[in-house]
Structures are given as C-alpha cells and as structure tokens.
Amino acid sequence: MWHSELLCHHLALSILPLSRARSAQAKDERNIMSDEATYVPPRVWSWSAGNGGKFAHINRPTAGARQEHDLPRGAHPLQLYSLATPNGVKVTVMLEELLAEGYHGAEYDAWLIDIQTGDQFGSGFVAINPNSKIPALLDVSGADPIRVFESGAILLYLAEKFDRFLPSLQQPALRAECLSWLFWQMSSAPYLGGGFGHFYAYAPQKWQYPIDRYAMEVKRQLDVLDQRLADRRFLCDDNYTIADIAIFPWYGALVLGELYGAAEFLDVASYRHVMRWAQEIVARPAVQRGRRVNRSWGPEELRVPERHSAADIS
C-alpha cells in the first residue's frame, strides 16, 4: 500500500512543474487576450467612417458606383484598368509574356486606376467589374466587347484565348495541376494580404493575436510552396504557366523582401526552393516590364503609370 502512495507522490511531483508551466502559459495568454479583447460586438454591426485602418477613407459596406466617370479607351484590342499591386501585376506580366512570344493580339492599353482616390468606384469601372477591384479587362477585339474581372479569371481567359501558358486539353493531368495551383493562389493570398499584411503593416494598432495567427498561416503556405518546388523548376514541373504568373507577385515578392517589410519576421530565407524559383522568375525580361506597368510609386525609373506601346517601357 505504501508503495502505491509513494508512487503517486513521485508522480505528482513530476507533473507539478509541467502543470505550473501550463498554468503560466495560460495566464500569459489570458493577459494577452484581456489586453486585446476589449471590443464587445453589438447585436447588429453598423459602419462608421473609422472602419478600415489605413484604407478607411475608401472602404464602405456597400457596392456600386459612387460617381459618374467614363473610362478612357485606347487603340489596342485589350484595355486594362489596373494598378501595380500583386493582383494587377499578374495581368501585366501575362500580357508582356505573350507579347514577348509574338502574340500581337495581346497588345494592350493599360490605364491607371488609383484605388486610394476611389477610381474603382467610378461608373465606367463598375460597369466592367461590379466588385470594384482591380484589375479589370475589356477585350474589344471582336464585334462585342467582353469584360473580364478577377485576376485569376483574366489569366485563364488570356491563356485560353492565346493557347499559351496553360497545358492543353490533350494534357488533362498537367492542365488540372496547373489550374489547381492557380486556384490555390486565389484561395490562399487573402490570408497573406487581407490577413497578415493588414494586421502587420496597415492596421491602426499592432495586435499580437491576429499577427500570430496569420503569420502561422503564411508560413504554412510558404512551406507548401517550398515542398512543391523542391524537385521541380516551376509549379507545374518544367512548364512556366499561369500558376507561376499568379503566385509570383504575392509569394515571390514576399520572399524577395518586397511585401510588408516582413522578410525577416517571417524568416523567408529559410524557404530556399521558393527563393530559387522567385529569383528565376524575377529575372525574366517580361516580368521586369510587367511589374512596372501601372506603377505610380517608388523610384521614378520604375514607374510606368500608363502603357500604350512597348516604347512606354524603356
């Protein structure tokens, strides 16, 4: 009997430090949450002008045009209305890649949409994209103009229109792989941009919980890419496709230290396969040109606010 009591006593002593550690950790977490969880949601949410942090002056909980404003139109078959954010860069890179391969039907006019001043809420832009987000494309090469909005939809539209940068229907497995990675980017990037990027770089205050939560998810995504690229040149084996064109402006720019000033925080150098892939893509001449189009900030030599011919990108 006394052996059992002694064993229980020793077991309790061995568990005690772990229990105390867990208790201390729980206390720390409660302290963090008590500092941050001061907001009590009302029964029904209502908008105020201060909602939205850095972008509060343009964010609203309603859709539709806020002002009458027609969009300009140039002479080329494709009219792009955009800005050189990651989503905008996807499309200009795609167009520059097509032009580099001699697809003259991909000639385009790129018009600047200044999202800080609300250009995306003009009636002309909303007529092309009712969601008021860049990029938006108008194909005027046929009898009736075709509108395309959402960056992934534009990439897919252009890939099918020119039969380039997307495996053919005769390669169903490779095509499915490419489309899977394209839509992986569409579903994953909001955690990087609207989640991590917002709370790390743009929110009015620094809150640990959302930064930790989204940093964990972004690092998981980087690991997904790193494992995928460990034994292949591009996302779809040796084929440079719209999957790479879609993913690079977000995750390539991130590991190259160009997004949110978060390279060290996220230890991006540890994702060496993603880094190798990003460095190869950023060296492509068409990528370098596409990244400059609709850019209205940064060094003057990198800015090409509007593009109407190849001569605009010196």
Sequence positions of predicted segments:
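Ala/Thr-enriched low-complexity intrinsically disordered regions
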Residues: 12, 21-26
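GST-like domain detector, emphasizing the conserved glutathione-binding G-site
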Residues: 28-212, 219
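GST-like fold's C-terminal all-alpha helical module
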Residues: 34-40, 173, 180-283
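A contiguous, mid-protein "functional segment" used to position or interact
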Residues: 88-92, 269-295
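Short, flexible helix/strand-to-coil boundary loops that buttress conserved ligand/catalytic motifs
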Residues: 169, 193, 258, 291-294
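Acidic/histidine-enriched, glycine/proline-rich intrinsically disordered or flexible terminal extensions
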Residues: 297-314
